[in-house]
Amino acid sequence: MLNEFPIFDYEDIQLIPNKCVIKSRAEADTSVTLGNHTFKLPVVPANMQTILDENVAEQLAKGGYFYIMHRFDEAGRIPFIKRMHDQGLIASISVGVKDYEYDFVRQLKADAPEYITIDIAHGHADSVISMIQHIKKELPDTFVIAGNVGTPEAVRELENAGADATKVGIGPGKVCITKVKTGFGTGGWQLAALRWCAKAARKPIIADGGIRTHGDIAKSIRFGASMIMIGSLFAGHIESPGKTIEVDGEQFKEYYGSASQYQKGAYKNVEGKRILLPAKGHLQDTLTEMEQDLQSAISYAGGRQVADLKHVDYVIVKNSIWNGDASH
């Protein structure tokens, strides 16, 4: 029962160091395998319209990073798969659960993507289970990620239906207001929810939402994530698709949630909001910094690779990791 677990979030946790066994952090290996492919980092930019487009997806794939293309340009998905495969790159797309998506999946038989993510806000649903089974029947070699969920029961059901990985997180993201609009979600206890779900999982878990710092990547791995989906930290780059807006001489990029009025059109029910982020530099600079910070984390863990982070001790320090840092 959940009540037996301590409830905490990223800012409540500090990992405890072990003796370092490498001469330099550069020796630490940050790569991770998901399905039949190995990627440079255990992170994936959120499959949102303001985070990536086809060009960013291509840049990520060429660089050896995992990506998931969003599902908001439905007609462009088959040409996108062809574009990626023509270059010898992996194709990784998203689908919903509407009736027409069943026909779409059948159309993929001629050129199946390596990864499909079934992407709906409340993934513990009969509609998702049915779509997992359909994809597995039509495209048995495609790696299926299903979500989003927030309970061990959901993880087990989706895995049993055939999902190869589950995505955990209901509304913890910076531009997600599901928790406010509905009263439901993992906002404020996403890391504890990840731990709870990971204990039940037999297959990889992708932690989705609530990441505010690079240290949160290491914490996610400690509590059971194989891959971490990140939105706001990847938003606002020069390559990001969001509009660039100038305010008082400063450049900002817009960033909005996947069920916001900006993405859905003004009159649909919304569970996302729009914010402006100061424009950042190049995406590759952020990826490199993430890699270096994760290498440092692995060295603090006394390890050589990502999996070594799973075994470190931790303490719960209620909301105090910013103590003594006046800038937060």
From Swiss-Prot:
Quick one: a GO biological-process term for this protein? purine nucleotide metabolic process
Cellular-component GO terms for this entry: cytosol; GMP reductase complex
TM regions (residue ranges): none
The answer to keyword Oxidoreductase applying to this record is yes
UniProt GO molecular function: GMP reductase activity
Q: Recorded E.C. number(s)?
A: 1.7.1.7
Q: What exactly does this protein do?
A: Catalyzes the irreversible NADPH-dependent deamination of GMP to IMP. It functions in the conversion of nucleobase, nucleoside and nucleotide derivatives of G to A nucleotides, and in maintaining the intracellular balance of A and G nucleotides.
Return the similarity comment. Belongs to the IMPDH/GMPR family. GuaC type 2 subfamily.
User: What is the protein name for this chain?
Assistant: GMP reductase
Protein's organism:
Streptococcus pneumoniae (strain P1031)
